[in-house]
A protein has these predicted regions:
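Beta-strand-turn-beta hairpins that frame and shape the catalytic cleft
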Residues: 1-4, 112-119, 183-188, 260-262
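Active-site neighborhood of phospho(di)ester-bond hydrolases with catalytic His/Asp-centered motifs
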Residues: 6-7, 31-36, 40, 57-62, ...
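Glycine-rich phosphate-binding loop signature in dinucleotide/nucleotide-binding domains
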Residues: 23-28, 148-150, 209
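Active-site neighborhood of divalent metal-dependent phosphoester bond hydrolases
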Residues: 47, 53-117, 126, 130-150
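Anionic-ligand binding region
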Residues: 139-154, 159-180, 185-189
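Acidic, His/Gly-rich catalytic cores of divalent-metal-dependent hydrolytic chemistry
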Residues: 167-298
Length: 298
């Protein structure tokens, strides 16, 4: 079955509309969103509505949580954007729809398992907030701990940098693998990139198509709410990680094995980023830099 995995929309309606249209043109019926629907961008309400309408599974991102609670660890620009986003979702002129949006955000799980696949926003260790950057392949201790929590394949977002991490301390950017990767016996973590705020030097919107070799009848679904996590303090020194926030999952249940090859395809799509930029410029609470960076994909 073919599924689309999207992440890090960040209130960028122009990018999201292009991605949804491309997914539809591919004949794909199921879309999974890995979080951060909002934050940074000028259209938070519209993006939430599109995700509600189109996505079968949606996970909680750190910016989604930041809108509901006090933002933690955000820089000044990101914090101002989140407070502005919260104001849009509290606007009394759209009270009924905003109540539905808050209810939707409040019910989002932090992780989802489907067959041999684990889906998170950040990492398998801390699904909300931990970053896994390409340069982390040189931090073997960190990577070993992360892969210990991956049964087979993990998909994530959060860094806005797409690519494939292997258990052998390698990272492959999409252009290095001709934008396609076939999964084998080894464990991998795959970053699906960002729809609305790419940061790999390519300003085009990014998402992933997963051809998973499973039929709908073979798939076991499991979304795990925050309350079922247990906190542990097992991170070692020098990992650039706060042990007080580390989270570990219960051992994954046995899942169906794919009956065919599993392929991942990275899709890059141009969109009218200038329209998004001008919207950002027109909102005083949003830093102009949030628009400028869309031109460079940084």
């Amino acid at each position: 079955m073919r599924r689309a995995l999207i992440s890090d929309i960040h209130g960028n309606l122009e990018a999201l509309e292009v991605v949804l249209a491309d997914i539809k043109s591919q004949g794909i019926k199921e879309i999974f969103c890995l979080g951060d629907i909002i934050g940074y961008g000028p259209n938070p309400r519209e993006c939430i509505d599109r995700v509600i309408e189109n996505c079968k599974v949606t996970l909680l991102g750190n910016h989604d949580q930041g809108a509901m609670f006090d933002p933690d660890g955000f820089n000044i620009g990101a914090e101002r954007a989140i407070f502005w986003t919260r104001e849009q979702l509290e606007n009394p002129s759209d009270r009924v729809n905003n109540e539905k949006r808050w209810e939707f955000l409040g019910m989002l799980p932090r992780t989802h398992r489907q067959g041999p696949f684990l889906l998170v926003h950040g990492s398998p260790r801390n699904p909300l907030s931990e970053y896994i950057f390409p340069e982390d392949i040189y931090n073997h201790r960190k990577m070993e701990r992360l892969f210990q929590l991956v049964e087979k394949y993990c998909f994530q977002g959060h860094t806005h940098v797409p690519g494939v991490f292997t258990e052998g301390y390698q990272f492959f950017a999409p252009e290095e693998i001709d934008h396609e990767y076939t999964l084998g016996e080894g464990k991998v973590m795959i970053n699906v990139g960002s729809v609305g705020q790419p940061r790999d030097g390519d300003p085009r919107a990014c998402y992933v198509i997963l051809e998973d070799g499973l039929s709908s009848s073979e798939v076991a679904l499991e979304s795990i709410p925050t309350a079922e996590y247990s906190l542990i303090a097992s991170a070692g020194p020098g990992e650039d990680f706060d042990p007080e926030t580390e989270e570990r999952f219960a051992p994954p249940a046995k899942s169906s094995s794919p009956s065919g090859p599993i392929r991942v395809t990275f899709r890059r799509l141009p969109y009218d980023h200038e329209a998004t930029i001008q919207k950002i410029y027109a909102i005083s609470e949003l830093e102009p830099f949030l628009g400028d960076r869309l031109r460079q994909g940084r």
